[in-house]
Amino acid sequence: MSTADRYRKVFPVTWEQLHRDAKALSWRLLEKGPYKGIIAIARGGLVPAAVIARELDIHLVETICISSYQWQEQTSSHKVLKTVEGRGEGWLIIDDLVDTGGTARLVREMLPEAHFATVYAKPAGRPLVDTFITEVSQDTWILFPWDSEVQYVVPLVNQPQQS
């Protein structure tokens, strides 16, 4: 399935909104802790993990590095670039988003005892995470602030109509 077919909508997230949503996630996670530390899924989970680490006063932050996207195309293969030891007991895994669940499934297999939280969740991946804040439809591309910049956009009325 091509990107054009898969993503029919774009959901832009600002730095302020991401911070607000990550803090809201922290409120939900507060009652489920305490945690030994955070395992951030790089790269998308790094910024939310920093906010959550501050809010939960967690000083130990590890990373697991998995490559699955090439721009807007999600690849079918996941490349594990860095992992962590253990089964995840007492640890909090943080990612920005669970989409199709490919990355989440792989991390769940590696760290089955960790608590898995994401800021945003799509229906296909939602069952793989324990806690999330905002659900977004499967056909929506979430445009994170680290992937965008402020620029002029043509008003909707002047844009070509999509079927």
From Swiss-Prot:
Pathway info: Purine metabolism; GMP biosynthesis via salvage pathway; GMP from guanine: step 1/1; Purine metabolism; XMP biosynthesis via salvage pathway; XMP from xanthine: step 1/1
Molecular function terms from GO: guanine phosphoribosyltransferase activity; hypoxanthine phosphoribosyltransferase activity; metal ion binding; xanthine phosphoribosyltransferase activity
SUPFAM superfamilies (UniProt xref): PRTase-like (SSF53271)
Binding site for GMP: D99, T100, G101, G102, T103, W141, I142
Residues binding 5-phospho-alpha-D-ribose 1-diphosphate, per UniProt: R43, G44, D95, D96, L97, V98, D99, T100, G101, G102, T103
PROSITE patterns: PUR_PYR_PR_TRANSFER (PS00103)
Membrane topology: Peripheral membrane protein
Binding residues annotated for Mg(2+), in chain numbering: D96
Recorded superkingdom: Bacteria
Protein task: Purine salvage pathway enzyme that catalyzes the transfer of the ribosyl-5-phosphate group from 5-phospho-alpha-D-ribose 1-diphosphate (PRPP) to the N9 position of the 6-oxopurines guanine and xanthine to form the corresponding ribonucleotides GMP (guanosine 5'-monophosphate) and XMP (xanthosine 5'-monophosphate), with the release of PPi. To a lesser extent, also acts on hypoxanthine.
HAMAP family: XGPRT (MF_01903)
The protein, known as: Xanthine-guanine phosphoribosyltransferase
Gene: gpt
